Amino acid sequence: MKLNKHYSELNESYLFSTIAHKVAAYQKANPDKDIIRLGIGDVTLPLAKSVTDAMLKAVEEQGKKETFHGYIPSEQGYEFLRSAIQKYYAGHGVELDMAEIFVSDGAKSDLGNLLDLFDVDNTVLVPDPVYPVYVDDNVMAGRKILYMSASAENNFLPMPDDNVHADIVYLCSPNNPTGATYTVDQLKEWVRWAKANNALILFDAAYECFVSEPGLARSIYAVSYTHLRAHETP
């Protein structure tokens, strides 16, 4: 039996765990200091009543013979939920076919599981700084990783370089951790680059609900959807 040698290339601990340990040590040494936390985020408000009511109703249905149900009829998720997602996107000018919508257990899992579709010889392009999951998933698979600087010089929004080739590129907008957000025109440039390089864009839109300024993109699909080379994880 052989272990996956690439696991030894991972950092010793998850970034946010390291930050938590450093914060705890600093607090112990400086109990009178207030700390502004810029590490991993967490919820700060209770769930809306409409959400908790729906959860209670779903649990009650599972306790009655008439409404009990087991596995979801479709591997793509409940149709009523996929339909709601379709309507949500349509409200922002993006038309999606129901067959294109897949409900999973979350974007974090998708970002790793999607990689099973691609050979380990593919080169991956990620922004720097970066959400650690993008890097760790590919390190464990043994893929080559290229970094593109996201700094004040480019407003923390790296743009494609025609001299750089990659097979998979990760874009997060609004970005984690910088908060920078691509415009529709900037994403058009990324789509053009992806087509020219026969590459796939993995677009992490986990924070799109914070976009309110006109001209900023809420979805990669806002860019000429036909023949688009991208997958989005909201």
Residue ranges of model-derived segments:
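N-terminal small-domain helix-loop-helix segment of the aminotransferase-like
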Residues: K2-D105, N113
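Conserved beta-strand scaffold positions in the cores of enzyme catalytic domains, especially
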Residues: I35-R37, I145-Y147, R229
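Acidic-residue sensor for enzyme active/binding pockets
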Residues: D42, E208, E232
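Generic enzyme active-site microenvironment
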Residues: L202
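Single conserved hydrophobic/aromatic residue that forms the stacking wall/gate
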Residues: H227-P234
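Conserved core of the PLP fold type I
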Residues: K65-A194, E208-A222
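A short helix->loop->beta-strand "cap" motif at the edges of active sites that frequently abuts
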Residues: A196-A199
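Walker B catalytic acidic pair
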Residues: A205
